[in-house]
C-alpha cells in the first residue's frame, strides 16, 4: 500500500529537478521587436478605421529558469485614421506615420516562471497601472505551455510522443491580460521551407543549432473563464462573465495566437509571436454586426546576447511589488498613488507540489477535471479581484470607483478630475450652461445638445458630494425665474438623477427635504432613480428606506405614491436581478442574509395594513403595487389573508393583488402558478379575480395535464368572462413565436381542441399576445378584465416588448383600472353639471319609477368605495396614480379652473437609457461599448381667457428630440484619447403654434385659428430632422463637445452623397443620402426613414424639414366646425318620397347654413321619424393659398321607416368659385327582425337593400356619376345550414307539439335572421375610367384572404358577389350590424351552436307561463290579473342622494294577464306610461292613459329635438317600443314580451322578474329586500303590485315569501388558496387529514430546505420551516399550545395546538388563521380541564367534534421583547 505514495514522492522530486530549460537560457539576454496595432471601425459599411500603432523593443534578461528581468525600451506610437482597403491588418508605409514617444517610466520589471509558465509580474510601486497592464499585454504574448502545465483533461487531448518532431493538441486554463480562460493549444512541426522563406516568422533559424521548428497555435475561449475583469451595466441579466461572449450577444470576442519556436518541446527558443484579438459589436437592434475592434500584437526575436549589465540594484528590488498573474489589474483612480488592487499569482493546475496547498487557498479558481466549463458561481458573489472595497461602497457621499470607463481612467489611468491641466469642474459648468442656452434657443441643433447632455451625465458620475454641491451653487446663481436659470436647473436636475451614484441620491434627498423639488416634479424624479442607479449597495438602499419613511414623503401628495414604488423597484432590481448591475466590478451588492429585505417587505406590508385601518384606498393601492413590484416571495404571505377572505377587502383590490403577483410569477412560476390556479378554480370568487388569475396562470407555462384541465373546463364553467379569458389567451399564445414562450405555445396548440368553441364579444375579458416582425418592437401583451356596468373593460394592461426591455419587464407599460364606471360617470356628471334644478324638481314630484322602487321597498346593495388607478411605466420612468372619488373631485375642479382662467402647463425634461460593457483587450487597454438613448422633451401650452368666456387663445410649443448612440472602441490612457467608431441616429420634431378658439354654443359652432409661433426673419426654422451618421473618430477625453464638432471625426461615406431638395410653399425638405445608386426624391422622402429604421441599413442619411420664417404671416390655418341635429316629426316632416332624393344642388360656401339645411332636407325626405346629424367642416390657408376645403357629412336612422341614410359632400373652392366637388348619398332599407315569431323568421328570408350615388367633377351636377345598388342576404349555403341545424329542427318540433321552448326558439329565431352575402351592381357613365380601380378593389378583396372570402365578379354586368367568413347579425337596439364568425359547411353540426351564442343578444322573454331572464335563467311564472314588475331600475345610493335615479335610466316594465288569454304591458319611461294591450285581434297603445292610433309606419314621441320613444309595427304584426334615450326596447305580440336593455346602463342595475342582469344566473331570484328565494312562485310574488286590485296566486305567494327563509345574496366566497409552504411557513395545516401525518410532515421538512426554490433570494435562510419543526421553533421562538376560549356558558378548546411566542418574546409579524373549537358546558370538570391546559397540558382533541370556528392572530416569528 506504500508503493503509490513512494511513487508519488519520486515523481515530485523528479519534477522539481531542472532537467530542461523551456524557452529561456539562463544568463542570456533576448531582444524582441514589438509591433502593436489596434483599430476600430464600422467596417460592415466601409473599411475606415481609427486607432494607434505602437512599436518598441522588449529586452529580457534570464536570471534563472524561474526568474526573468525585463525592460521595454524606445516605446513609440502613431495615430492611424484612414481607409485600409485590405482590411485592418494592411501594411502602412512607415513614412506615412508620425511616431511619438509613449510616456512610459522605462523601469525594469520582473517575471516569475514555474515550469516555463509565467506566474507573476513584479513592478516598481510607482509605475503607472496603465503601463503595467500594457506591459502585461506584451509579455503575455510569451506565455507558452508546451508541457501542459495548465492542461485540462479532455477527450480531445493528444499528448506529444517522445520522438521529435511531434504534434500535440490539448486545452489549458491560461491567463492573459484579457482574463484567465480556456485556451486550445495546437502544436505542429513547421516545414523547413517555411522557416527559410518566412524570416518574419523565423528570424533566427539557426538558434538553437539542434531541434526543429514548431508552430504553436492558441485559440482562447472567452465563454469559459475562471477570472475576467469586466464592467457592465444595463445588459441582459444573462450577460455574465461566463456567457457574455456567447453568440448573438452584444459583444463577441475572438483571440488567436501563432507562436513559432525552435528546438524541442522541452527546450526551445521563441522566434516570433503574433496575436490577433477581435471584438465584434452586434447591438440588439441589429441583425448583423455593425463593426469590430481589431488588435494585433507581434513580437519578433531580434537578438540573443549574454547579459552584460544588471538593471536592478538593492534599492530597486526593495520597491517592487507583485501584480499577480497576467490578468488586468486596477488602481484607485481617485488616489494620488496607484493603490493597485493586486491579483494573485497564477497557479499551476498540474503541479503536484502546489495543488494540495494553493488550490485550497483559492478554491474558486479550481476547475473541474471532468468538465471544460470554467464558470464559478462563487466568483460572482465574492470575487477576490473586485475593483472597489466594501468600505468605499458604504460611503454614499463618495464618487464610485467605476473601472474601465473613459472619465474614470482616461487620464493616465486616473479620473479626469485629477488633471492639473484642465479645470474639469469648470468644464462641467460651461457644458451645463451651454445645454441650458441651447434648449432655450430653438434654432440650435438639438442632436448636439443631447450628446452634450450624455457627456455631462457621465462627467457628473465621477463627482463626490462636495462637487455636486459646487455645481448646485453654480446653478443657484442664476435666477430660477429666468428662462436661462430655469433651463440650467432642469439640466442639472436630470443629469444628477441619471448619474445614478450615491452622491447623486444624497443630492436628490437634500432637494426633497429642502423643498427644492416637490409634488409631481419630486415624484417623477424619484421614479427615475431605480432606472438609473449604478450601485444600489445595501447602504444606498438603507438611505432610500429612511427617505420613504420620512414625513416629507409620507405627507406629500404624489411623492407618497412614487417613493414607495421606486423603493420597491430598487429592491427588485437589487435582490432579484443583481447581475444586471456591475457585480463583477464591485462584487455582490446585496446582503447575504434576508434580514434587511424582510425588514423592508414588512414595512410595506404594515403600510398596507395601515391603509385598511384608515380606509385610505389610495394608500392601499399604492402598497399593493409596491409589494408586487418587489417580486419577492414574502409578499405571498402578505396578500394571503386578503385573498382568502380572512381580512376584509374589495374584489377590485383582490384583483390588483393577483395582478401584483405577476412579476413574481415570472421569476418563480412553480411557486405562484398553483396559487393562480386555485384562485381560478374557485367559481364562487369574483370573475374579475378569476380572469386575472387564469390569464397569469397560463403564462407560467403549467404542466400539460393542468393546461388540458383548464381548456376542458371552459365547457363547464358558468362564467363566460373567465372562459373568454382562457380562450383568447390560449389562441394568442398559439401564434406567438417568442423564444420564451415556445414550450407554452406548443402546449397551447395541443389543448386548443378542448376549448369551448363559443366565440365571445370584444367586451368580454381577453388576453392578447401579439408578435411584431420589427427590429425594435418585439411584441404586445394585452390583458383585459371586463366590467359589469360598462362596455369598457374594468382593467386594462398593455405591455410593449422591444429591444430596450428593462430587467425582464416590457419597455413600455400602460394600463388603468376602475372599480365602477357607473360611479365614475355619476360623479363626473354631478361635478360638471349643476343638479340644483333637477333636485328641486325631484323633491316636488318623484317619477313613477322612483315611486315604484319605494313601494317595492327595494334595498340598494352596499356599494364599495370608488377606486381606480392609471399606470405608465417605461425604461425612463414610471407613474402610478391611484385615485378615489376625492381625487376625481380635485381633478375636475382643476380642469374647470384650467379652462376658465389664464393658465400655463409646461414641462422640460431629459431622459436617458443606457447600456455599457467594458473589459480589457489583449493589448492591455480597455474596450468600451456604450449604448445611449437620450430623449429631450419640452412642451408648453398657454390658456388665455377671452371675451366671451368661450373664447380662448394661447401658445402650444412642443419639442421632442431623441438620439441613439451606438459607440465602441478603446481608451489610450497615456494620451487621454478615446478611439471611437459608431453610429448615431437623431430624430427631432418641433411644433410651434399659436391658436385661437371660439365656441358658439347657441350656433353649435367651433372655430379654430392656428399659425406658426415663429418670429419673422430672413432665416429658415427647422421643424423635423432625422439623420443616421456612421463615423470614426479620435477624441480627447477632456473635450466634452460632440464628436461631430471634433476635427478628427470622419463620417463613414460609402459612396457619393446625393443631395436633394423639395419645396412646397414655406416648407422645404432637404435630403442627403449615402446610397449605392441614385434614387428619386419622392422615394427618399417616403421611404428614407423607414429604410433607415431597418437594422441592416446604417448608411449615412440626413432628412430635414424647414420652415421659411418670413412667410409666417401667410401660414394661418382656419378650421371651422359646425354641428347640428334635427329631429324629424310631424311638424317638420318633408314631402313624402318613397326613396331618397340623390340629386340636389348644394351651396358650396364654407360654413353654409343653406347647405346643411339642404342636406337635412335630403336625408329626412319622406321619413316619419329619426334624428338627422350633420357635421360641417371647412379648412383653409387664406393667406398662403386661395383654396378652401369643405367637408360635410350627414346621417339619419329612422326606426319607423327602417332606413339608414348618409350624405357626404366635399369641395375645393377658391376665388368665389368651385374647383372640384364630390357628392355621395346612400340609403339602406333594412328589414326588421321579428324576435317573437320564429315561423315568420324562418319562412321569410331577411334582405337589406342599398342604393348609393356618387358624383364628382367640377360640380356634382355636371360631373361623372356612379350608381351603386346592392343588398345583403343569406347565401344558399348559410340558409341550408340554418334550416337543417339541430336548433331549428328542435324549435319546429316543439311548436308542432304545442310545447314551444323559450330558450330554444329564441336562439333559432335570432340565427334565422343573419346575413352573409353582399351583392353589388355598379352603373357608371364613365365606366372605363374606373375599371382599373374596380379591378384593384376586387384584387384587394382576394388578396386579403382568398381562402376565406369568396369573391365573384362579372365584368359584363358590373356585378360583385361577396360571401365572407363573417355573418352580419341584425341588432334590435344598435344602428347597424354586429359581426360573428360563420361556421363552414364541414363544421355545421359542431359549430352552429357557436353561431347561436354569438348572434343572441342578452334579452328577457316572458312566454306563456315561463320567463327567460337576461342571465338565461328559465323558470315558471303565473302572473294572474295582477301587475308584476318585469324590470325596474332603483336608487343606487348615488352619493347619498336618497331615492334618486338618473333621468336617463328611469325605466320600468310591468305586465299582467287579462281575460282573453293575452297580457297588458306597461312601459314607464320617466313620467310617461305606455300601455300595450290586445283588443280582439288588434294591438292597441295608450300613452299616459290616452289611446293612440299607431299608423302603419309607427308612432313617435319627442320633446323638442329629442326623441323619447318610437313605436314600430314589425312585419309579423307585433309592436316594438324603442327608446334610444333610455336604452331599452320592448317587443309585444299580445301575449309574449321580449325586452332588450343597454348593458352599459342596466347591467347589474335592475330588479324584477327578469333578474338583476349581472351575468350570473344563480342569483336571479333576488327579492327587493336583497334575499334569495328558492321557489320561483314566491320570488315572482315579491314583485307583484298586490295593492292594485291584484287577482291570482300572487297575494298568497307573497305572504309565503315574507315568511320564507331569507338567504342573503352570496358574496364572492374566498377559500384557502395559499398553503403554508407557498407562504414560506412551516406546514401546520392538515394535521387531522389522512393516516400518515408524520411522514407528510417529514416530507415537507425535506422540501422546505429548498425554500422557495429560488437561489436569488437566499431562501434557505429565510424559510421558516427549516429542515424540521424543532429548527423552526428554535429559530423563530415559537411554541405550540392549545388555546382556551370562554363563550357565555361554554369553554372551548382548539382541536390542534396554536403557535404562540415563547416567554419574554413578542411577535414580529402576525397572520390570521381559522381554528376548529371543541366546546364543553361550563362546569367543574371543564374548568379543571381549562386549568390543566393553561398550565401546559396538551390533551388530544383532534378526534373531538367541532362546535365552532374562530380566527386567531398567530405569530409568524417572535423576537426578544
Swiss-Prot record:
* Disulfide partners: 181-225, 1404-1554, 1426-1590
A Pfam family annotated for this UniProt entry: VWD
Q: Which InterPro entries does the UniProt record give?
A: Lipid_transp_b-sht_shell, Lipovitellin_superhlx_dom, Vitellinogen_b-sht_N, Vitellinogen_open_b-sht, Vitellogenin/Apolipophorin, Vitellogenin_N, VWF_type-D
Q: Which region ranges are annotated with the description Disordered? A: 336-386, 1627-1675
Task: Report the leader peptide range.
Answer: 1-16
Which ranges are annotated Low complexity under compositional bias? Answer: 366-378
GO CC terms on record?
A: extracellular region
User: What keywords would UniProt list here?
Assistant: Disulfide bond, Glycoprotein, Secreted, Signal, Storage protein
Q: Origin, by domain of life?
A: Eukaryota
The Vitellogenin domain is annotated at: 24-796
Where is this gene product found? Answer: Secreted
Q: Does the keyword Nucleotidyltransferase apply?
A: no
Principal localization? secreted
In what ranges is there compositional bias, type Polar residues?
345-356
| Glycosylated residues in this chain | 383, 560, 615, 1284, 1342, 1345, 1460, 1668, 1724
> GO molecular function of the protein, one example?
nutrient reservoir activity
Record has Glycoprotein as a keyword: yes
Q: Do you know which Gene3D superfamilies this protein is assigned to?
A: Lipovitellin, beta-sheet shell regions, chain A, Vitellinogen, superhelical
Identify the residues that the record assigns to the VWFD domain, covering every copy: 1402-1591
PANTHER family from the UniProt entry: VITELLOGENIN 1-RELATED, VITELLOGENIN-RELATED
The role this protein plays is: Precursor of the egg-yolk proteins that are sources of nutrients during embryonic development.
Q: What is this protein called?
A: Vitellogenin-3
Q: Which organism is it from?
A: Solenopsis invicta
